[in-house]
Amino acid sequence: MSDFDVTICIVTQGQYTAMLNEFRTINPNLRDRVDDPPVDDDNIKYIALVGKFKWGPWPPLFGPNPVENFRLGAAWVNTSTGYIGGVFKTNLPANVQVAPFLLDATKALGGTWLECFDGKLRETYAKQGFVTVARSPFNREYAPETWNYDVEGEPDYLVMALPGSPTHKY
């Protein structure tokens, strides 16, 4: 991200959904990996990570609204329960990390816990301070439709929380 100036924006449900639909179109093999936000819940806050190249002005062709610039990733948080969901990055190289920015923003809005499969996401979330508080064996009955068993195996399902949060105590 060193070539970019980035910022976190609060966005509307419609803007978040548009980004999510774009992600699902570009990444059909991951289309069922990102949670849809609950419908009609006033406790949901949507965020987007957007950026621009440092050496140029905010490009006018993307419009005055920052969400119209380079969309790098998004997430949502339920401010009443602390649940963080729908974290994704756009079609960026694997080495471009957006999760730290998104998780810092969701934590600032009251996010304290999330779910994932054991593996790279667990490692990413652990670097942001989340610890595993519950672990369940992989269950094919609940596996995403697009799950690739040959590549992804059958990792445990995890609930991770920030230490000291209500979810961490269980």
Located regions from the model:
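Glycine-rich acyl-CoA binding loop
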Residues: 91-106
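Non-catalytic substrate-recognition and accessory regions of acyl/acetyltransferase enzymes
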Residues: 1-92, 108-113, 120-131, 135-170
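Generic non-transmembrane alpha-helix signal with a bias for helix starts/N-cap capping motifs
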Residues: 99, 117-119
